[in-house]
Amino acid sequence: MYVLKNGQILNESGELENKDVLIQNGKVNLIADSIEVTSGEEFDATGKLIAPGFIDVHVHLREPGGEHKETILTGTKAAARGGYTTICSMPNTKPVPDSKEVMERLQAKIKETAEVRVLPYASITTSLGTDELVDFEALKEAGAFAFTDDGVGVQLAGTMYEAMKRAAALDMAIVAHCEDNSLIYGGVVHDGIFAEREGLKGIPNIAESVQIARDVLLAEAAGCHYHVCHISTKESVRVVRDAKRAGIRVTAEVSPHHLILDEEAIPGNDGQWKMNPPLRSKADRAALLEGLLDGTIDFIATDHAPHAAEEKNVPMEQAAFGIVGLETAFPLLYTHFVQTNEWTLKQLIDWMTVKPAECFKLPYGKLEEGTTADIVVLDLEKEATIDPDTFYSKGKNTPFVGETCIGWPVATFVEGTLVYKEGESK
C-alpha cells in the first residue's frame, strides 16, 4: 500500500487540483484532499503531477533474436523510466510470433522478466512479409493484442483484405506499417531537399499514402478496425481524415520525432537520423500537428526502435532504420509543445493515456477511484539534458542527444507496484 502525498492531479477541465492518492491491492483506492493511514508507505509527491501511466502501442523489444539491441527486461525498464505502464511489443523478432507455440513462449518470457505490462502483437503473415496468413484464432487464444507485420507493408491487397476479414470476425485490429515496396526506390531518407543535397536516394510520400488509401477501402469492405502506424505525410493525414468522415473504422498514431523534427533538422549523413518513416518536409510536419489537434490522428506512440551502436554509427546508406523513444517522449513533447503553449497539459496526457486505451478498448489510461493503479509521477519543474549514457535501454540511438528538456517522470507504478523511482540504480 502506498499513499502519494501532496501531489496534483488533472481534472476533466484540465485544471490542477491538490490531492493525495491511496494505492491498495493494485487499485486506486481513494483520491482525496488529505489521506492519513497508519500503515503502508508514504510517497512524497509534493508539487508533482500524479497522472495515469502512459500507454505505448508501438515498441520494439527485439527479444527473442535481437538481444544485442534490447531485451524484454531492458526495454521494460526503459518504459518504466519513461512513465509507461503498458506497452505493445512488435513482432519483428526471431522467431516471429506467427504461431500459438511461439506466442506462448513469448508470453512466458514476458511474465518472467517484464517490469511493466507488455501486450504482444502477432504477425499478420508467417515470418513477416509473406502472403501466407497466420492462424488468427489460435493466436488470439494465445493472447495476441492485435495483428501487424510492422516493419513491412502487406503488399498484396487480397492478402490484406482476407486478414482484415479474419481480424474483424474476432473483433481484433489490423495494425499497419504502410509502405508500398514498389515505391520505396531503395530510399534511406525522405525524398526532399536533404536527399537532394546529400545525393541520397529518397522515399517519396506516396510510398506511405498510397497503401493507406488502399487499406482504408479494404477496412470499410471488411468491417475491420484498421490502425495506421507512425503516420508521416500530409497526404496520409488527408486520407485518414476523409476515411473517418466516411465512417470507416480507422485510427492513427504519430511518433514524437515526426512532430518535433523535419528533414531540415538533419545535420548531415549521420545514421542516428535514419528512421522509417523518415523525417519529412515542413509541410508534412505541419499537417501532422494539425491532424493531431483536430482528431484525425488519435494519439502518440514512440516506435521505440533500439539498435546496437555499430548499426547506427555509420552513414545512412549502411545504418539500420529507427531511434529509441521510451525514455524521452514525455520530456521532449512537454518541452516543445506544452511549455510553448501550443498544447495543453491535458491534451498531451490524454494522447499518451486515455486515447490509445479507448482506441484499443484497454481498461487503462485513467486515474480514478477503482481503476488499476498504473501511475506516473511527473516533476514538471525538473530540467535535464538527454544523455544516452543514462538510458536504461540498451539502445542509445537518438538524434536528441544534448537537448535540455523540462518535465520528467520521477516514479512509475504498475498495478500498485513501484517499478521506477528517480535516483535508484538501474
UniProtKB/Swiss-Prot annotation:
**Its pathway?**
Pyrimidine metabolism; UMP biosynthesis via de novo pathway; (S)-dihydroorotate from bicarbonate: step 3/3
Specify which residues bind Zn(2+) 1 according to the UniProt entry for this protein.
H58, H60, D150, D303
Q: How the cofactor binds, per note?
A: Binds 2 Zn(2+) ions per subunit.
As cofactor, the record names:
Zn(2+)
Q: Provide the residue positions that the database annotates as binding substrate.
A: H60, L61, R62, N92, N276, H307, F321, G322
GO cellular component terms, semicolon-separated? cytoplasm
TM stretches of this protein: none
- State if Glycoprotein is listed as a keyword: no
EC number(s) from the headed UniProt entry: 3.5.2.3
What the entry lists under Gene3D superfamilies is as follows:
Metal-dependent hydrolases, Urease, subunit C, domain 1
Please report the name of this protein according to its UniProt entry: Dihydroorotase
